[in-house]
Amino acid sequence: STVYLAWKHGCKPIGTFAHELYATYQGRADVPVAMAQKKVMEDWSTEYDGSLGIALSDNFGFKSFLNDFGLKFAKLFDGCRHDSGDPIRWGEMLIAYYNKIGIDPRTKVGCWSDSLDIDKALAIAKHFNNRIKVSFGIGTYLGATICGTKKKPLSMVMKVVEVNGKPVTKLSDSDGKTMCQNEEYNNYVRQVYDYKSIDDMTVDEIIKILPTFKNVWLTDIYTPMAA
């Protein structure tokens, strides 16, 4: 819908690919499941030739994503998108990753899009100011709120669960956001990608792979107004 609106109004589309792309590639006969994540990034960067350069980072978990991202994709893509797990911990890991591979994180973009409202976005922006370029995708709060009421915003999500007769999955870094209708396949993909949620990783586990990581959580820098 947003691509259509950009075309209709003559605006430049800004964004990234969706979880559905990672899911669809799992169902392709010519793509091994273990290569689905890399293949998506390869094909996307080839198709758009540098445009729309924000990589979605959580379909198989952010830890697994960083294993596949590497120096090549880190240079090709403008930045990465957060959509699950603690947003501050994710940002600290992303900055530490860029530092590790010799890229100045201030030249890259962190794009947050998970359950945002204006106050949370401002808190994230303040925390990462001058450390990485900050961008936000605010959908539900801005696009599905009934104006002039206190009704809870509508949350409408569609994901791919089967392709060519094969189950597919979205793991994510948050409890409750996994999307798969086949438990056996879901467990298989977790093993293939050595999955572990960033929220469940210990500080020592993270520092072992990202030595400059700073252990900060959203709750350390932000308290919701209603709390």
What are these regions (language model features)?
Residues 62, 76, 85-108, 113-227:
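Gly/Ser/Thr/Ala-enriched C-terminal appendages of enzymes
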Residues 1-93, 98, 123, 128, ...:
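Buried, small/hydrophobic-residue-enriched core segments of structured protein domains
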